[in-house]
Amino acid sequence: MKKFLAIYIGSASALAKWKTMDEEKRKQQEKGGKEAWGRWVMANEKSIVDNGSPLGKTKRISAQGISDTKNEMTGYTIVQAESHEKAAKLFENHPHFMIFPGDSVEIMECLPMPEM
């Protein structure tokens, strides 16, 4: 089985829209989203290698030094699957973008490290 990194993507505009939602409605949606995410984890537990976590602020390090930067990555999960397509299918209708204000999930294969 191959390993794949799933990056949860969420734009600032989607989050801003979420925050304008009626507080009671948002709380209900958050509760339902957490429950749906838990069901997704249970349904895919054999494929999940690392549940991952939310991601915080970003620092960029380059030849010019260290600086603050922004991106739309909000979290990650590592899964295993027979193919890239099958890994992507695990995230169809995922609560990240079906219930929560996430935009998408990007899936990339974790390739073996080349010999040094």
Predicted segments — roles?
Residues 1-116:
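Conserved, structured core segments of small domains
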